[in-house]
């Protein structure tokens, strides 16, 4: 059926800020969909609240709104734009839930807006547990024994009937939010109570546990003519019980017999036909390893994380095809853009193995609960392609950037037998390393299979890796064995370790023996048809399919997996860098390992190499392509860390030179540069051991800010107030970066602001200054940022501009740099300089309309600001106010403290823009899902040093009409100052929560919590109590404030929205 001509304007809803369970894959899907619809001649209107995305660039849709995805704002936009249709299946759960709300409130009907793609009734059938159960029963597809509970008591009755263990799945939530596996009634009570609160329809599915079954996924497509295909099937390394987003996944499936494959394929197609899905859909199934019994786990009736992985694994662009199906086109009339010959009806065939491994945030959250279950915890993922399981798995392991280059980890090597067994049985993020170590220790794989329920086929592959290791140890420099090791994914570093030589020596011997990788094309058809996709992976075979062109080439290094501190913002900068290179007529080559992002869409760059971002893997591509040089500025710390080794190997680093990157990153060199430039910084020193750190802190004076050098996202950074805490830190956290010293700085609690600057070597452009709402001490990535600044005097602004110019020129910056300042007692100090693109680039690019990454790339390639029409200095400020707000994923991370400090904790960001600060703040809070009720109770439990400041806020809350609740000390202080306060009991370290503030939060008697810990390391009881209070507020979805500056901001909003009532 040809595309529809009765609709002209289509609105797409994006997925909002990045949280665990809903990450960059939706930027990739949304970008693809917008471009596909524009390609077919439709006018596209986009609504998304996340500025850090390519999707929200002006050129992706015809009209872009960066506004909160709430009923209030989306309705307003619908009324203003009057689109003919709405496409909701590309914005993750956020987009789907919004469409449901718009439909149920009658707005779509009122405005005569049609929903495209999968019908709402089908979405309801797939998402509503009861309706889905009825559907599966009607088509004879087996589900787990289950029932729906709307109360805790109902859940207990159902569990008693089915028998423990039980799986709890809240309805209409994403990434397994609020769910879990329960072995006891006590666990069930706790998980169901939380799950009911998080489910928008107050429903939980209580189902039998099939933990231990194989988990298989099918990515399927269907059109309105009922044509349906399987794009890709995938198999989880971990059995059922671990969320698929956290599991290691292989594509295509590896252990299924042909009968099993066909049986599950038929079931997936049966379901998609019955649901009448139009577009992409993900079906998850569980297969009993000992019989042909299977269960349908769930269906995602939309583009998902798995579809992004399937798209990159096969080269088949699922989101693009889904968008075309939504406008009435059928699979047999859409051309496959990979081959440009076959149609979209043609099922992809793979002649390689793809491995995906999740990237977890536990390097930042050492106290986080690492146990993996049905609730997702990964922030990102990596993908690797190889000709066998061993190769793809080991390439994926070294793509993770967790300090390992092989499937071995120091902690696992040092573990005793008891710990090995415990870590194998427990499903944790690092289980692969302990299972591998157990095999090295000689534990039979049959025993491991029995303990872990991991298929013996996968364990046999790990055993094969161990056998190659053992052969390498005793056959040093043997060329045939070296070739075998490389074919199975071994890195030069691992071989060097086994041979006790340097990686350079291994590389030299490889090249001498002509053991070099070839690059194979990802073509969707296992080379059956000729394909022209410039999408490659390395392997050690004969024929090289990546042909070098005659054009001048630039290699751009991506930023690898998404993690806290290095998010989608860096991918945004990478994509814009590529566009600028292409505009200058050069060939842009991207190297990256992240399947979720726009930069790894093969249609973006001239060539894409899906490879780990390690020296060896990058160098192999450079050897083949012989580029003019490499750009490292846009790939975050990942790319910056490769600058030095690449430069030493004779590779030209374009833009700011390696010695100048070093001057910004190395403490002593940076201090000298600041002295030479006459720019003040907070007093500080470096220390290489505990005694040196104590001596330095005593000299500088407490409080001090302490951190390792060369880190991103404030890793292992703390504010320390006394010697005892400092010694504790040095013993606990200093291993964060062993090769580099620890930095000890005077902690100035002033106003913080930051600047992104672009320099051509002579002139410096400052697109804007961002002012942070939270004072120094809260990581810049976790601070709310306001542009243009609202509280800086002209003298301070002039000083910031002057220091920025001096630094950019003094550090020989070519391209981009980011500088963070603190203003303390009217004096401007430089805290740090990052000689690269920072996480604020997308936000500032959007609000100033200056394409910063593209401009910086033009500088790197030799152009200058003046010729491009830009004046040096601070760019003119617009008349709107823009606020960037951090977004956190604490609901997914049990035992992670939400108290904000110098270590970054946010996973994403949202933006609010309006004509006044108050309105922009309101939008940013709404977009970040920090919604304050118009009235209710606010609970204060604050540190002694914060009580004076809290008094003014308490008065303001009372004035608006809020009731005040506080713990004893805070309550007494507020009462003394004439306020009416209801006093609640502290926990005092006890287990009994009855009558305490925690019970108040749990029972919904409190609408907001203000909890500060002050600057001294609190006593264990106070610290534990504070942690439990914060956890309770987060799990109940109650706004929590751990910084008084954020409280001041939200009060500004509430005051601007409330009327004053005074008697005459």
Swiss-Prot record:
SUPFAM superfamilies: Carbamoyl phosphate synthetase, large subunit connection domain, Glutathione synthetase ATP-binding domain-like, Methylglyoxal synthase-like, PreATP-grasp domain. Residues 930-1064 are annotated as: Allosteric domain. Residues 930-1064 form the MGS-like domain. Mn(2+) 4 binds at residues 832, 834. It is an enzyme of class 6 (ligase). It comes from the Bacteria. It comes from Lactococcus lactis subsp. cremoris (strain SK11). Belongs to the CarB family. GO terms for biological process: 'de novo' UMP biosynthetic process; glutamine metabolic process; L-arginine biosynthetic process. Binds 4 Mg(2+) or Mn(2+) ions per subunit. Mg(2+) 4 binds at residues 832, 834. ATP 2 binds at residues 707, 746, 748, 752, 777-780, 820, 832. The large subunit is composed of 2 ATP-grasp domains that are involved in binding the 2 ATP molecules needed for carbamoyl phosphate synthesis. The N-terminal ATP-grasp domain (referred to as the carboxyphosphate synthetic component) catalyzes the ATP-dependent phosphorylation of hydrogencarbonate to carboxyphosphate and the subsequent nucleophilic attack by ammonia to form a carbamate intermediate. Residues 133-327, 671-861 form the ATP-grasp domain. This is Carbamoyl phosphate synthase large chain. GO terms for cellular component: cytoplasm. It catalyses: hydrogencarbonate + L-glutamine + 2 ATP + H2O = carbamoyl phosphate + L-glutamate + 2 ADP + phosphate + 2 H(+). Residues 402-546 are annotated as: Oligomerization domain. ATP 1 binds at residues 129, 169, 175-176, 208, 210, 215, 241-243, 284, 298. Pathway: Amino-acid biosynthesis; L-arginine biosynthesis; carbamoyl phosphate from bicarbonate: step 1/1; Pyrimidine metabolism; UMP biosynthesis via de novo pathway; (S)-dihydroorotate from bicarbonate: step 1/3. Mg(2+) 2 binds at residues 298, 300. The lineage of its organism: Bacteria, Bacillati, Bacillota, Bacilli, Lactobacillales. Residues 547-929 are annotated as: Carbamoyl phosphate synthetic domain. Its EC number is 6.3.4.16, 6.3.5.5. Mn(2+) 2 binds at residues 298, 300.
């Amino acid at each position: 059926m040809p595309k529809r001509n009765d609709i002209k304007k289509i609105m797409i809803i994006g997925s909002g800020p990045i949280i665990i369970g809903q990450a960059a894959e939706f930027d990739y899907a949304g970008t693809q969909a917008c471009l596909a619809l524009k390609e077919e001649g439709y006018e596209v209107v986009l609504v998304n609240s996340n500025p850090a995305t390519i999707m929200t660039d002006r050129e992706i849709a015809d009209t872009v709104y960066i506004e909160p995805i709430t009923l209030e704002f989306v309705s307003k936009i619908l009324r203003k734009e009057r689109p003919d249709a709405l496409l909701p299946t590309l914005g993750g759960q956020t987009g789907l839930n919004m469409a449901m709300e718009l439909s149920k409130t009658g707005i779509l009907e009122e405005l005569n807006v049609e929903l495209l793609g999968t019908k709402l009734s089908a979405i309801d059938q797939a998402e509503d547990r009861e309706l889905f159960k009825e559907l599966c029963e009607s088509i004879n597809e087996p589900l787990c024994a289950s029932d729906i509970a709307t109360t805790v008591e109902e859940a207990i009755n159902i569990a008693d009937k089915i028998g423990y263990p039980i799986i709890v799945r809240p309805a209409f939530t994403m990434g397994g939010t609020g769910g879990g596996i329960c072995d006891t009634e006590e666990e069930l009570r706790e998980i169901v109570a939380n799950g009911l609160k998080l489910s928008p329809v107050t429903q939980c599915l209580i189902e039998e546990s099939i933990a231990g079954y194989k988990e298989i996924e099918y990515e399927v497509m269907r059109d309105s003519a009922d044509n349906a295909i399987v794009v890709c099937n995938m198999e989880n390394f971990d059995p059922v019980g671990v969320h698929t987003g956290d599991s290691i996944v292989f594509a295509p499936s590896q252990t299924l017999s042909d009968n099993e494959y066909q049986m599950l394929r038929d079931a997936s197609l049966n379901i998609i036909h019955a649901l009448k899905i139009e577009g992409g859909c993900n079906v998850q199934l569980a297969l009993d390893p000992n019989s042909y019994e299977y269960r349908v786990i769930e269906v995602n009736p939309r583009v998902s994380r798995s579809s992004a992985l399937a798209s990159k694994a096969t080269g088949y662009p699922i989101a693009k095809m889904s968008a075309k199906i939504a406008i009435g086109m059928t699979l047999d009339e859409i051309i496959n853009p990979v081959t440009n010959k076959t149609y979209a009806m043609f099922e992809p065939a793979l002649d390689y193995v793809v491995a995906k491994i999740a990237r977890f945030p536990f390097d930042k959250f050492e106290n986080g609960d690492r146990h993996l279950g049905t609730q997702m915890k990964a922030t990102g993922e990596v993908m690797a392609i190889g000709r066998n399981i061993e190769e793809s798995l080991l390439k994926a392991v070294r793509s993770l950037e967790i300090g390992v280059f092989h499937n071995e980890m120091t902690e696992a090597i040092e573990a005793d037998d008891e710990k090995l067994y415990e870590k194998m049985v427990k499903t944790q993020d690092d289980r692969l390393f302990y299972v591998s170590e157990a095999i090295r220790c000689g534990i039979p794989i049959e025993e491991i299979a029995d303990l872990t329920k991991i298929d013996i086929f996968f364990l046999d592959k790990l055993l094969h890796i161990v056998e190659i290791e053992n052969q390498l140890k005793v056959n040093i420099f043997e060329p045939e064995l070296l070739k075998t090791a490389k074919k199975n994914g071994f890195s030069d570093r691992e071989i060097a370790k086994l041979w006790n030589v340097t990686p350079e020596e291994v590389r030299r011997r490889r090249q001498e023996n002509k053991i070099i990788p070839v690059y194979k094309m990802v073509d969707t058809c296992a080379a059956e048809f000729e394909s022209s996709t410039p999408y490659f992976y390395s392997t050690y075979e004969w024929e090289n399919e990546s042909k070098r062109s005659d054009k001048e080439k630039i290699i751009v290094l991506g930023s690898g997996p998404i993690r806290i501190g290095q998010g989608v913002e860096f991918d945004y900068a990478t994509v814009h860098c590529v566009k600028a290179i292409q505009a200058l007529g050069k060939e842009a080559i991207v190297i990256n390992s992240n399947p979720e992002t726009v930069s790894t869409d093969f249609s973006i760059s001239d060539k894409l190499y899906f490879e780990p971002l390690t020296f060896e893997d990058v160098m192999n591509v450079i050897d083949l392509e012989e580029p003019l040089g490499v750009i490292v500025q846009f790939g975050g710390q990942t790319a910056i860390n490769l600058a030095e080794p690449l430069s030493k190997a004779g590779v030209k680093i374009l833009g700011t030179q390696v010695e100048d990157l070093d001057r910004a990153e190395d403490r002593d060199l940076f201090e000298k540069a600041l002295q030479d430039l006459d720019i003040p910084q907070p007093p500080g020193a470096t220390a290489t051991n505990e005694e040196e750190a104590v001596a330095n802190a005593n000299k500088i004076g407490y409080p001090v800010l302490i951190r390792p050098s060369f880190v991103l996202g404030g890793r292992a950074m703390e504010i320390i107030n006394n010697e005892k805490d400092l010694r504790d830190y040095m013993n606990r956290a200093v291993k964060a970066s062993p090769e580099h010293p620890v930095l000890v700085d005077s902690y100035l609690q002033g106003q913080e602001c930051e600047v992104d600057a672009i320099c051509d070597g002579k002139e410096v452009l400052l697109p804007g200054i961002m002012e942070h709402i939270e004072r120094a001490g809260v990581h810049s990535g976790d601070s709310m940022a306001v542009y243009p600044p609202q509280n800086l005097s002209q003298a301070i602004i002039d000083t910031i501009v002057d220091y920025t110019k001096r630094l950019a020129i003094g550090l020989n910056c070519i391209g981009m740099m980011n500088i963070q300042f603190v203003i303390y007692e009217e004096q401007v100090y430089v805290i740090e300089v990052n000689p690269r693109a920072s996480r604020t680039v997308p936000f500032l690019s959007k609000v100033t309309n200056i394409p910063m990454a593209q401009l910086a790339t033009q500088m790197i390639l030799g152009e200058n600001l003046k010729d491009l029409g830009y004046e040096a200095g601070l760019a003119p400020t617009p008349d709107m106010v823009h606020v960037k707000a951090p977004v956190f994923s604490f609901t997914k991370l049990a035992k992670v403290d939400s108290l904000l400090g110098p270590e970054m904790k946010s996973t994403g960001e949202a933006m609010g823009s309006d004509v006044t600060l108050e309105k922009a703040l309101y939008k940013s809070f709404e977009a970040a899902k920090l919604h304050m009720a118009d009235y209710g109770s606010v609970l204060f439990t604050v540190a002694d040093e914060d009580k004076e400041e809290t008094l003014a806020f308490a008065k303001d809350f009372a004035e608006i009409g809020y009731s005040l609740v506080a713990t004893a000390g805070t309550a007494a202080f507020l009462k003394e100052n004439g306020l009416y306060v209801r006093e609640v009991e502290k926990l005092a370290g006890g287990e009994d929560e009855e009558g305490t503030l925690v019970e108040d939060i749990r029972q919904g008697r409190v609408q907001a919590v203000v909890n500060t810990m002050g600057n001294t390391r609190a006593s264990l009881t106070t610290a534990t109590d504070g942690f439990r209070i914060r956890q309770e507020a987060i799990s109940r979805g109650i706004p929590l404030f751990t910084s008084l500056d954020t409280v001041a901001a939200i009060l500004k909003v509430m005051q601007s929205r409330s009327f004053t009532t005074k008697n005459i």
